[in-house]
C-alpha cells in the first residue's frame, strides 16, 4: 500500500501566515500538522508528499529532521494557485508520473484526525471498494458548509457539495482509501468530464465531484469515527485544532500584567505586556503591548502596540 499526502495548496485563506510557509508544516502543539498524519503511516511501503516547487525544500527538510525513511517529496508542475492543477488533477498527474499500481491512501495534509489509521485500514480490507472517512458534525446548519454524504448502512447512497438542505450531518473529509482495482477511477473520471461542459478547474479541483460521480459506478463506503477532526483553513479551525492536541494554554513567552483567556498559544521569545488575549496564536519573537487580541494569529517578529484586534491574520515583521 502507498499513500499520497496532498500538500500543494497555497492556503490563501490563511495568508499572510501561509504566504511563504506550507500550511501542513505549521506547528500544532509540539510538532507540525503533517506529523500527526505521517507518524501513523510508518508501516506503509511508501508515502509521497505531493507539493509545489515553492515548498518542496521545506518538506524535504522536515523529512530529514523527523527521519521519515518511507516518505519522499513529489513536486507538482506549478508555482502559483492559478497554475495549480487542482486536487484531483494533482493526483492524476502523480499516478501517471509514479506509475502507481497499488492500494492507495489519499490524505489532505492540512487536516487533523484523531482516529487510529490501523483501525481504518482493517475496516478497508474488509470492504471491496473505495472508502471515504466521514465525520458527523451533528448539526444541519453546520452541514451546509461541507460535502455531505448520505448513507445506507456504511455504503454511500448520495453525495451533495455544501447543500442548502443536507440529507445528513456526515461530512466527507479529505481521507480516502482506494483498493488497487479502483485506482483507475481517477482516469475514468477525468475522461468522463473531458467530454462535458464542466470547466476543468471545477472537476479537477473539487474532490467531492469524484465521490459524487464514482459512487454511481462502484460501491463506495464510509468510515465514521468518534473524536476530533479539523480542516485547518481558518483562524478558528487552527485555534480549535491546537486546543484539541494540548492540555490548556501554551505560554512559552513572557507575560506581564496580562489577562490570558482560553485557547492562547504564545511561542518562544514573544512578550505580552498589559494585554488581553483569547482564542489566539502568537508566533515566536513578537511583542504585544497595551492591546486586546481575540480570535487572531500573529506571525513572528511583529510589534503590536495599543491595538484592538479581532479575527485578524498578521504577517511576519508587521508593526502596528
Predicted regions and their residues:
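Short alpha-helical oligomerization interface
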Residues: 19-24
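Short beta-strand-to-loop element that shapes/binds the nucleotide-sugar donor at the catalytic cleft/hinge
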Residues: 131-148
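Conserved hydrophobic/aromatic beta-strand scaffold that supports enzyme active sites
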Residues: 132, 148-150, 175-177, 229, ...
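A structural signal for short hydrophobic beta-strand segments in well-ordered beta-sheet cores
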Residues: 25, 148-151, 222
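Structural signal for interior beta-strand "rungs" in well-ordered beta-sheet cores
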Residues: 250-320
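Short internal beta-strands
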Residues: 47-52, 133-134, 297
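Catalytic-core segments of class I nucleotidyltransferases/pyrophosphorylases
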Residues: 105, 112, 118-125, 138, ...
Amino acid at each position: 500500500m502507498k499513500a499520497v499526502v496532498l500538500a500543494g495548496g497555497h492556503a490563501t485563506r490563511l495568508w499572510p501566515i501561509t504566504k511563504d510557509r506550507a500550511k501542513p508544516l505549521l506547528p500544532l502543539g509540539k510538532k507540525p500538522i503533517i506529523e500527526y498524519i505521517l507518524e501513523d503511516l510508518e508501516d506503509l511501503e511508501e508515502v509521497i508528499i505531493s507539493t509545489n516547487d515553492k515548498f518542496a525544500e521545506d518538506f524535504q527538510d522536515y523529512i530529514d529532521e523527523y527521519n521519515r525513511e518511507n516518505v519522499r517529496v513529489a513536486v507538482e508542475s506549478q508555482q502559483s494557485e492559478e497554475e495549480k492543477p487542482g486536487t484531483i488533477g494533482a493526483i492524476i498527474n502523480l499516478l501517471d508520473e509514479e506509475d502507481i499500481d497499488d492500494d492507495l491512501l489519499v490524505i489532505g495534509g492540512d487536516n487533523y484526525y484523531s482516529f487510529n489509521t490501523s483501525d481504518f485500514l482493517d475496516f478497508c480490507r474488509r470492504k471491496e471498494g473505495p472508502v471515504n472517512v466521514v465525520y458527523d458534525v451533528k448539526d444541519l446548519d453546520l452541514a451546509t458548509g461541507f460535502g455531505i454524504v448520505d448513507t445506507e448502512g456504511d455504503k454511500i447512497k448520495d453525495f451533495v457539495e455544501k447543500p442548502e438542505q443536507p440529507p445528513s450531518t456526515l461530512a466527507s473529509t479529505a481521507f480516502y482509501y482506494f483498493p488497487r482495482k479502483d485506482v483507475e477511477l481517477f482516469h475514468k473520471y477525468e475522461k468522463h468530464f473531458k467530454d462535458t461542459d464542466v470547466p476543468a478547474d471545477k472537476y479537477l479541483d473539487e474532490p467531492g465531484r469524484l465521490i459524487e460521480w464514482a459512487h454511481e459506478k462502484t460501491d463506495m463506503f464510509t468510515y465514521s469515527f468518534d473524536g476530533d477532526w479539523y480542516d485547518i483553513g481558518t483562524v478558528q479551525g487552527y485555534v480549535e485544532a491546537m486546543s484539541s492536541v494540548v492540555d490548556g494554554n501554551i505560554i512559552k513567552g513572557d507575560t506581564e500584567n496580562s489577562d490570558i483567556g482560553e485557547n492562547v498559544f504564545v511561542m518562544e521569545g514573544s512578550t505580552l505586556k498589559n494585554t488581553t488575549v483569547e482564542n489566539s496564536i502568537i508566533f515566536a519573537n513578537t511583542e504585544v503591548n497595551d492591546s486586546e487580541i481575540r480570535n487572531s494569529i500573529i506571525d513572528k517578529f511583529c510589534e503590536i502596540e495599543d491595538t484592538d484586534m479581532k479575527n485578524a491574520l498578521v504577517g511576519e515583521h508587521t508593526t502596528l
